[in-house]
Amino acid sequence: VYHDTRVINTFRNTVKSLQAGNHIIIFPECKKGYNQILCAFQENFVDVAKLYYKRTGKALNFVPMYLAPRLHKVYFCKPICFDPTAPIAEERRRICQALMDSITAQAESLPEHIVVPYPNIPKKDYKTNHSTEAIL
């Protein structure tokens, strides 16, 4: 996602793609530490759900996904549904927190493995899913 006026086109194209029945994968991590599994999420990607609701009248689900390359697995967790009646700032926080909590819980429940972090850091600094030290 671009951080200038192109973001509007990105959101519009995303909504069009969703309306066409496509699934969208969003990787919302930023370079701010959160825990040993994830970096914090940028929140504004949730605005796609608001725009989608305005266009379709349907609430969008965000499906938490955890990639565990060392285990050769992709895990999908319980969907988190956008609430169009809630203030958007509140929904951004709620959805991001629910996604981060769900992904973290999924990762921690798995056998010990190396977590491939969002930031480009040396492999020697990679943590495991059972580490107590945050990524950043």
Locations of regions flagged by a protein language model:
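Short, flexible loop segments at the rims of nucleotide/cofactor-binding pockets, characterized by
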Residues: 1-5
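Non-catalytic C-terminal accessory region of glycerolipid acyltransferases
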Residues: 8-136
